[in-house]
């Protein structure tokens, strides 16, 4: 069943904040019998334009993705500046951080969640799309993330562009 409010029922990601992304990725890989994922660093501020609590931040994270069925486990090791990832790690230790829904119409969905009393805590860009985290911990037990992927322009071949 599709959520009319978010326009999707597709959970695409479970985010886990960790102190050591390599060790945690190795442990998950061994447990699930999956290959060790690539560890990469999120984009720099000039591209990502990350905002935390309404202000620009140079926050980054070392990250790895493990695909399990149609859901990715996203492992995030905070690097540096203030972020929701740092807050989670400092307050709760390694723990589940977010559940992500893939959506279209980021502006409308952000406004809807704001109207529902959920405060935007962090947002940014990445190659191929954008994300927004909402402070839903007290109400839902987890941070809510919206992910919007860029769509290829009509009439273009995604494989060659």
Regions found by a protein language model. Give the residues of each.
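Long, hydrophobic N-terminal alpha-helical segment
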Residues: 1-50
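Vicinal oxygen chelate
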Residues: 2-5, 11-19, 63-72, 74-77, 88-105, 107-161
């Amino acid at each position: 069943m599709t959520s009319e409010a978010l326009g999707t029922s597709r959970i695409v990601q479970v985010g886990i904040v960790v102190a050591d992304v390599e060790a945690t990725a190795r442990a998950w890989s061994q447990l699930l019998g999956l290959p060790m994922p690539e560890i990469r660093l999120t984009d720099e501020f000039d591209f990502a334009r990350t905002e935390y609590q309404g202000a620009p931040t140079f926050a980054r994270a070392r990250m790895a993705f493990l695909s399990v069925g149609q859901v990715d486990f996203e492992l995030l090791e905070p690097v540096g500046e203030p972020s929701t990832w740092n807050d989670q790690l400092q307050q709760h230790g390694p723990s589940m951080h977010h559940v992500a829904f893939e959506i279209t119409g980021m502006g409308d969905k952000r406004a809807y969640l704001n109207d529902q009393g959920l405060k935007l805590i962090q947002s940014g860009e990445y190659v191929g799309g954008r994300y927004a985290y909402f402070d839903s911990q007290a109400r839902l037990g987890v941070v809510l993330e919206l992910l919007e992927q860029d769509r290829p322009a009509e009439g273009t071949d995604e494989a060659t562009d």
